[in-house]
C-alpha cells in the first residue's frame, strides 16, 4: 500500500508519494512474486492495494486473483469486489430496470478523488432506468489533497464540495463515518451535513449490492 502523506508533515522526514512509473514498477515486482508463490505454495500471498493500480493507470486484477479477499478491510481489492457485487446484483434485475433511455432523476455519488473515475465507469456500464448518477470527487483539504481515499473525507470538505451541486440525493460510503455511524472525522454529524447541503445524504455499506439496493430503494421511495 502506498504511503499516505497528509498536509501536516512540517519537521518530519521527507517522503514522497509514488509516481505513475514507480507504481507500475511495484506492480511488476509484485506480479513476479505472485506467480512464483502461486506455483510453489498455492497462494499469490502478495496483494498490491487498489491505490497502486489506480496510480499506475492499470486495470485491477480479476476477482479470482484476490482469492479470499483477506485484506479487504484495509481496502485491498475493495474496488474489484464492489464491481463484482454490483454487477451480479444488477444482472439479476428485470430488463425494464436496466434501461438507459427515458426521463431521469439525478443522484450524486460523492467519493475520494482516487475512486471517482472507476465509479463513473461502473455506473456508465450499468444503467438504471430513471436514474442518472453523477460521481463527484471530493478533494481532501482537511488532511491534504494528497489524501485521496473516500474513507478520510470529512464532513466539512464534503459539504463544501456539494453545496452548489445539482442532484436530489447524495450517496456516500459508510467508511466516511466514525464507528458510531453518525459523525464524520471532523465531528460534523450526518444531520448537520444534511442541513448544509439541503437534501438527503445516504450512507451506504461497502458492498456493491448494498450500493445498488440503496439507489433503487431511494428511487422507489423505500427509504427516506
Q: What do the PLM-derived regions correspond to, one by one?
A:
Residues 1-224:
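Auxiliary Fe-S-binding modules of radical SAM enzymes
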Amino acid at each position: 500500500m502506498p504511503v499516505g502523506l497528509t498536509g501536516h508533515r512540517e519537521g518530519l522526514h521527507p517522503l514522497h508519494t509514488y509516481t505513475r512509473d514507480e507504481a507500475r514498477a511495484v506492480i511488476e515486482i509484485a506480479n513476479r512474486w505472485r506467480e512464483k508463490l502461486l506455483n510453489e505454495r498455492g497462494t499469490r500471498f502478495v496483494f498490491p492495494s487498489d491505490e497502486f493500480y489506480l496510480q499506475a493507470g492499470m486495470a485491477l486484477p480479476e476477482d479470482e486473483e484476490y482469492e479470499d479477499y483477506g485484506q479487504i478491510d484495509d481496502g485491498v481489492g475493495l474496488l474489484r469486489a464492489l464491481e463484482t457485487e454490483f454487477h451480479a446484483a444488477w444482472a439479476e434485475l428485470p430488463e425494464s430496470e436496466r434501461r438507459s433511455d427515458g426521463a431521469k432523476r439525478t443522484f450524486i455519488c460523492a467519493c475520494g478523488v482516487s475512486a471517482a473515475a472507476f465509479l463513473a465507469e461502473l455506473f456508465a456500464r450499468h444503467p438504471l432506468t430513471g436514474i442518472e448518477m453523477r460521481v463527484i470527487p471530493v478533494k481532501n483539504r482537511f488532511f491534504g489533497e494528497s489524501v485521496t481515499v473516500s474513507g478520510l473525507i470529512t464532513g466539512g470538505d464534503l459539504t463544501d464540495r456539494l453545496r452548489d451541486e445539482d442532484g436530489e440525493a447524495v450517496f456516500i460510503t459508510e467508511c466516511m463515518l466514525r464507528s458510531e455511524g453518525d459523525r464524520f472525522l471532523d465531528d460534523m454529524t450526518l444531520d448537520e451535513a444534511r442541513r448544509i447541503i439541503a437534501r438527503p445524504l445516504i450512507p451506504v455499506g461497502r458492498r456493491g449490492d448494498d450500493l445498488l439496493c440503496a439507489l433503487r430503494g431511494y428511487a422507489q421511495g423505500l427509504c427516506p
